[in-house]
């Protein structure tokens, strides 16, 4: 959902319009009982139509995680006009590469957790308590933790999570992509992205340095910024640096 992006509202202090939205299937756009909608085509059409509706002839496009995947697809397959730059934040160009990197990081966990995850993937039973505990520990290491009372209100605010859309499109977790995005593969097309691209990831991110470097090496006009000690939400864990970086980047590419 858009909630956690509200930590970036300060970017509007520079006189920019900041637009974020809940994609169909989560948050304020949550709907039930339409599993046929949970695919890339739906969310791509949503982005295209939203841009038309708001008259966004020129913009800087920021895609975080799945949003970055959608941005890559948008630039490579639709070749839109008016994109001043793209910010690819903690995202990836390949479901296969992403899964490989998650499994590599799983090997640093306890043998008990490794076994629980391997068993779940082998049996298809993702409800076992041992697996659920292992997955929670994995996500705590590389994604994010439970918001604290001292965190900004937007992080603590109740939200409608798009679990159904996530499972249908991606899978039961970050390292088992068995949904309809399992064949997502854009490594060979990254060279066709002509827009300036800022690639951001955290040192402890689900988006590992290898994933980020793969994008950096392949996109001609790109810059890579690695955030030390950050997980999958660099913009939350180091908001000040993230905002400074984005302001600098957008000014350079206006």
Language-model features: locations:
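Conserved HGGG/HGGXW glycine-rich cap/lid loop of the alpha/beta-hydrolase fold
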Residues: 1-32, 36
């Amino acid at each position: 959902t858009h909630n956690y992006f509200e930590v970036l509202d300060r970017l509007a202090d520079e006189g920019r319009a900041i637009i974020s939205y809940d994609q169909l299937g989560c948050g304020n756009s949550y709907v039930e009982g339409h599993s046929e909608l949970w695919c890339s085509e739906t969310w791509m059409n949503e982005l295209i139509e939203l841009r038309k509706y708001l008259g966004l002839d020129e913009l800087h496009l920021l895609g975080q995680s799945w949003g970055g995947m959608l941005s890559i697809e948008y630039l490579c397959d639709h070749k839109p006009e008016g994109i001043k730059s793209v910010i690819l934040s903690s995202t990836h160009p390949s479901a296969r590469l992403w899964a490989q990197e998650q499994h590599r990081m799983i090997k640093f966990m306890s043998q008990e957790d490794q076994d629980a995850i391997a068993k779940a993937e082998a049996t298809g039973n993702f409800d076992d308590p041992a697996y659920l505990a292992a997955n929670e520990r994995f996500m705590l290491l590389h994604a994010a933790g439970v918001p604290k009372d001292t965190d900004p209100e937007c992080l603590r605010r109740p939200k409608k999570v798009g679990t159904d859309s996530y499972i249908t499109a991606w899978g039961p977790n970050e390292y088992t992509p068995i949904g309809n995005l399992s064949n997502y593969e854009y490594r060979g097309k990254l060279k066709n992205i002509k827009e300036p691209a800022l690639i951001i990831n955290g040192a402890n991110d689900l988006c590992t340095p290898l994933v980020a470097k793969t994008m950096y090496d392949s996109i001609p006009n790109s810059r890579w910024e690695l955030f030390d000690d950050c997980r999958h939400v660099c913009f939350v864990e180091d908001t000040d640096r993230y905002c400074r970086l984005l302001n600098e980047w957008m000014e350079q590419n206006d």
